[in-house]
């Protein structure tokens, strides 16, 4: 489910580019608090169907405590989850494109491809 303008924009860019992708992609064993699966916003596949790169859109709550998202406690959990996701990608040699909320207006095919190393 697309929750934010940033996620909707990323979806549109990937879809319009004709890139094969899935939303809310998870890996077995990658879990957060209370063993809840940690999902990546988007997984983009290459021509062979293998993972090319993952895309995460990080809203403001990824960078500072926001009361409506649960304040400091939720922020601390969010940071732990973000670290786990980054570590997973590093350990499994998977490219991770992280798009911060303050770059929301810059989201484009070129922006995503540059961030993915193309």
What are these regions (language model features)?
Residues 1-118:
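Nucleic-acid endo/exonuclease domains
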């Amino acid at each position: 489910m697309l929750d934010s303008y940033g996620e909707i924009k990323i979806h549109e860019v990937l879809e319009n580019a004709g890139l094969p992708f899935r939303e809310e992609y998870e890996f077995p064993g990658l879990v957060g608090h209370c063993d809840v699966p940690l999902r990546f916003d988007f997984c983009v596949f290459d021509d062979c169907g293998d993972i090319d790169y993952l895309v995460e859109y990080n809203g403001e709550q990824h960078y500072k405590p926001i009361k409506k998202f649960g304040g400091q406690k939720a922020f601390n959990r969010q940071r732990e989850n973000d670290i786990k996701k980054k570590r997973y990608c590093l350990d499994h040699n998977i490219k991770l494109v992280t798009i911060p909320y303050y770059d929301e207006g810059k989201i484009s095919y070129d922006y995503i491809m540059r961030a993915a190393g193309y």
